[in-house]
Amino acid sequence: MADRAEMFSLSTFHSLSPPGCRPPQDISLEEFDDEDLSEITDDCGLGLSYDSDHCEKDSLSLGRSEQPHPICSFQDDFQEFEMIDDNEEEDDEDEEEEEEEEEGDGEGQEGGDPGSEAPAPGPLIPSPSVEEPHKHRPTTLRLTTLGAQDSLNNNGGFDLVRPASWQETALCSPAPEALRELPGPLPATDTGPGGAQSPVRPGCDCEGNRPAEPPAPGGTSPSSDPGIEADLRSRSSGGRGGRRSSQELSSPGSDSEDAGGARLGRMISSISETELELSSDGGSSSSGRSSHLTNSIEEASSPASEPEPPREPPRRPAFLPVGPDDTNSEYESGSESEPDLSEDADSPWLLSNLVSRMISEGSSPIRCPGQCLSPAPRPPGEPVSPAGGAAQDSQDPEAAAGPGGVELVDMETLCAPPPPAPAAPRPGPAQPGPCLFLSNPTRDTITPLWAAPGRAARPGRACSAACSEEEDEEDDEEEEDAEDSAGSPGGRGTGPSAPRDASLVYDAVKYTLVVDEHTQLELVSLRRCAGLGHDSEEDSGGEASEEEAGAALLGGGQVSGDTSPDSPDLTFSKKFLNVFVNSTSRSSSTESFGLFSCLVNGEEREQTHRAVFRFIPRHPDELELDVDDPVLVEAEEDDFWFRGFNMRTGERGVFPAFYAHAVPGPAKDLLGSKRSPCWVERFDVQFLGSVEVPCHQGNGILCAAMQKIATARKLTVHLRPPASCDLEISLRGVKLSLSGGGPEFQRCSHFFQMKNISFCGCHPRNSCYFGFITKHPLLSRFACHVFVSQESMRPVAQSVGRAFLEYYQEHLAYACPTEDIYLE
């Protein structure tokens, strides 16, 4: 049964997936703590851009909304999944029954009369009984192209059978032609009241009518599941007189009221038993199921699903949505790698999303075992419904969800200067306070973050979270915390709210954009984020309303970052934002890609060593080190111990000498800059974050990093707003400088040598985003650093390009002389 199951899964998902489509890689929030961004760009960016057609997705949602009846019953379907792969004993029984049927067919041909050529359409197929309230799904897949058939002459190449008694019919099974085409063993067919068995004629019904052709792979049918299409088409074809044969080769238009019986009709023709075990595993998140199913499907269908390079379809807005015309296909990035962050969470070709959408659009409440595919919990006051709100968001991203709901605007509106009129229509009462808006073109469930149970989302300052299924660990924690807080009728207390704040710590969920009262990107300094109390008076009234909504969680009316219960994150101001990991994480970050410097005792000092091992102090005078910590060695002891300063934590102490390696300093670059006077340009921008990438150049790589960094920070706007920084560009390289919050960390910087900068550029659709890729000084590793500004960042890109060009023109003469080519 293994080969049949694989063939079954392969053919099913060949019809479910568009041509040349690769399963999107998992882009989840917890991946920021791992070594790199390989899940985005495993194949150097070529796996980033495969997004299905937005027109197809719109037609999918529109087509399904026309059918208000319940699609299917998942309780019966989950109970009958075992019919797909049966045991070997039934295989042996079916083989014996097949031999008996062949003998019976031979007898029928010898003793058949002309009256047996046309079967009686009336009593052959029993009507559904009272115990079967739901229409059954089709039992098989049409795996071959059917030839022309004539029901009168019966020239379709199938054997005739004589009317048999009920004793003989009980021992008969499907014809060999149909049995070879079925994915698994089928039980014996039932008979009508007259005792005559319906002839086995795959591909046509009892009156010789050809069934509807199956949808082409990647077509815009109302649903991508053949089982759903069966129910949808059976409504339109119900007026025909004839009913489908029980052994028809899975026309998606079959009515399923056939002689297959209850077990035969409940078989779902899209999931094998092995995949069912993955999809119904209790306690696991839906993203785990989705990724496992996608991986198994990719392995099975990789030879057949990529016959030719995919053509470029019109795409939905992918990276930072910019304005009302972002559904066009004019994006020319010079690379095929245009990723969509939530494609894997919302692609209609994923099986888990088919199931979840069938759940959300059925008129009757349907629940899977353990509610494994149910949407995220929603407060009672939230007006967005699973089907209506999601469809409304997908069709008009700028439309408001309701008077008290979540309003969605695009990213260009957020970055643009304040317009005289509102950027998006706001039905209902006017909203006095500012709101945090997130673009949601991918039909994610929108839930307010701080909405208390029994109270609607505050219209003054609504914080929305796109609860994608792929954000498994983060959303699991948040859903559990939301259920715990909803269970307490007394409102949100600090006790049950602490785990939610723990799930929103800076190093777990990074890079969120913040919007002020003018719907612009709010430029928040690091001093405000560092915990200075006097900054709380500078907050606007809208931010005060946000603090009031989350007062119990964040503690009082202070700045949200001030009262974070995470003691390791209290020293956040001493870190170079997300570039440095906290003391509890052992994962390597991107701080080793440049030289870190900060003010120590009023003097700017650069790091001299980099920690290569984690050192846990055992005495009070020892210094704790984490991997890749920047260290300033002040003295070298005789016993191979160093006395130094950890620039990440701001602590001094001794540590073993072999726990840190010296970093190459820019001595030659300094000498070169002193000989020839160099220019320096400074820009005031906001630093969003750094993330490691597997390739040193490419617009696709750059846009993927920007997309991941900018969209993944949308949950931590209150805790970790973007920090302002000065970008100094010269022939030496690029230096990032930002202010700290402590007396000892008034200013810290990160320097990237020009020889290690390999690529830079602005976002093709939104020039407010800029990033550059740097190489590790010693290793073959690459990191992308992303910045944002209220204005266009093209002058920054031009300045870096100018410095890049001049540097290589100056050093190319001795670094790569042309005469070396002809030495031989």
From Swiss-Prot:
GO biological process: behavioral fear response; dendrite morphogenesis; excitatory postsynaptic potential; JNK cascade; MAPK cascade; mating behavior; modulation of excitatory postsynaptic potential; negative regulation of apoptotic signaling pathway
Domain SH3: 604-665
Residue stretches of biased makeup (Polar residues): 141-156
Biased composition (Low complexity): 268-305, 451-467
Acidic residues bias: start-end ranges: 77-110, 327-346, 468-484
Region (Necessary for interaction with FGF13): 239-498
Modified residues (Phosphoserine): S254, S302, S305
Tissue: Expressed mainly in the brain and pancreas, including insulin-secreting cells. In the nervous system, more abundantly expressed in the cerebellum, pituitary gland, occipital lobe and the amygdala. Also expressed in fetal brain. Very low levels found in uterus, ovary, prostate, colon, testis, adrenal gland, thyroid gland and salivary gland.
InterPro entries assigned: JIP1_scaffold (IPR047178), JIP2_SH3 (IPR035637), PH-like_dom_sf (IPR011993), PTB/PI_dom (IPR006020), SH3_domain (IPR001452)
Cellular component per GO, a single term: protein-containing complex
Disulphide-bonded residues: none
A Pfam family of this chain: PID
Domain PID: 677-813
Biased composition (Pro residues): 416-432
Region feature Disordered, mapped onto this chain: 1-28, 40-160, 172-349, 361-501
Record's subcellular location: Cytoplasm
Protein keywords: Cytoplasm, Phosphoprotein, SH3 domain
Gene Ontology molecular function, alphabetical: amyloid-beta binding; JUN kinase binding; kinesin binding; MAP-kinase scaffold activity; protein kinase activator activity; protein kinase binding; protein-containing complex binding; structural molecule activity
Chief location: cytoplasm
PROSITE patterns, sorted: PID (PS01179), SH3 (PS50002)
Region (JNK-binding domain (JBD)): 110-275
Subunit structure: Forms homo- or heterooligomeric complexes. Binds specific components of the JNK signaling pathway namely JNK1, JNK2, JNK3, MAP2K7, MAP3K10, MAP3K11, MAP3K12 and MAPK13. Also binds the proline-rich domain-containing splice variant of apolipoprotein E receptor 2 (ApoER2). Binds the cytoplasmic tails of LRP1 and LRP2 (Megalin). Binds the TPR motif-containing C-terminal of kinesin light chain, Klc1, pre-assembled MAPK8IP1 scaffolding complexes are then transported as a cargo of kinesin, to the required subcellular location. Interacts with the cytoplasmic domain of APP. Interacts with DCLK2.
Family indicated by similarity: Belongs to the JIP scaffold family.
Function field: The JNK-interacting protein (JIP) group of scaffold proteins selectively mediates JNK signaling by aggregating specific components of the MAPK cascade to form a functional JNK signaling module. JIP2 inhibits IL1 beta-induced apoptosis in insulin-secreting cells. May function as a regulator of vesicle transport, through interactions with the JNK-signaling components and motor proteins.
Name assigned to this protein: C-Jun-amino-terminal kinase-interacting protein 2
Gene name of the record: MAPK8IP2
